[in-house]
Amino acid sequence: LSIRRQRQMCIRDRKKAFPPKLYDLTSLQREANRYFGYTAKKTLDMLQELYEEKLVTYPRTDSQFVTEDMRDTVEELVGKMPVLLPFLDYGQLGHNITRVINNAKVSDHHAILPTKEAVEKGISDLTADKKNLMMLVCQQLVQATGEEYQYEQTDIMVKCQGHDFTARGKVPVQMGFKAAGNAFKNQCVKAKPEEETEKETSIPYGYEEGMTLSPVKAEKTVHFTSPPKPFNCLLYTSD
């Protein structure tokens, strides 16, 4: 089916996304389930064991920040993350420790972090599940202290033969913290989380308003939605 362009609009914006926060217990349980299928109890049990082995800080925390007096400690930990996460390209990341510091949002215990002992001992002797959890905690530290992700987003709207067509494309400008997240998922996560499998309609880079569209081939396809998944304990921990 050839489509003849009649009217179009092109909107291009520079956008950015901010790094995620550090983990508290709830957010770590949720992410461990999302990436590895661990139940909340299994995650807590493993965290408790890692804590007793002095590889992570206290796990039963509801804070996602650290205090100002921990600035130097966190700075040192971030600098040593290549020891535990050698697959990351640290040249793309940069870091900003101030992002994770907020005295007002730390009560009894700060966010979950790897420890200096973890760097010294290494994690190669851990079970596969514990190693997954340790790398999840470590990569979150790198992401949370990373730079912003910046990208150029282009939306086009075309009016053709009485029908509206839209498409969106994104071109990364600065990967920032996402460089760590992507490397972690490629290295450590076998199955991609469902919410990340959706693809946006792609458009050619450099598209400008007023350009002539080449004829395109179109076809109709049939898709089916799936019923919601049964509730599990992790759903009740969501914000």
Where are these regions (language model features)?
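Short helix-coil junctions and helix-kink-helix linkers
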Residues: Q29-Y38, S238
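Structured, non-catalytic alpha/beta "coupling" segments that mediate domain-domain communication
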Residues: T145-E195
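Single conserved hydrophobic/aromatic residue that forms the stacking wall/gate
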Residues: L1-R7, I11, D239
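Short amphipathic alpha-helical interaction segments
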Residues: Y38-E49
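Extended, highly charged linker/hinge segments and catalytic-adjacent loops that couple domains
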Residues: E53-M135, M175, A179-A218
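TRNA-recognition modules of translation machinery and tRNA-sensing kinases, especially anticodon-binding
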Residues: N132-Q139, Q153
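Short acidic, hydrophobic short linear motifs in intrinsically disordered regions
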Residues: P19-E31, Y58, P230-L235
